Amino acid sequence: FVKMNHSIADAAALAIFTPAGIIVHTGDFKIDYTPVFGDAADLQRFAELGKKGVLALMCDSTNAIRPGFTQSEKTVGKTFDAIFAEHKNNRIIVATFASNVDRVQQIINSSNKYGRKVVVEGRSMVMFISPKASK
């Protein structure tokens, strides 16, 4: 397993060693040098695999064909802080994927920082943030 970053916790790529050669399967990933939680992707390990020779690379990254780069997820947290600071007396409704636990945590952090209540809707969201989910 090779450490990767993505919107889900514990994302990893697989390096599969076969008699014919090394096959690398990344799954969907995002290179984030300053992730909200956890370590950055293990690019050193990818370099080591490359030096050994990779027979096939199967990878997927959202917006990979779009020029430029995607900012760190930490940028989103700063944006939430700015929104909460600007709208102290207004209701704020945020929609996100329940599986994007880094983003959900940043929403909760900003809510707490500005003394706001968090109301969770949706079965998946409730399941992901419930204390029971960690058991």
Task: Locate predicted features.
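His/Asp/Glu-rich metal-coordinating catalytic cores
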Residues: 1-135
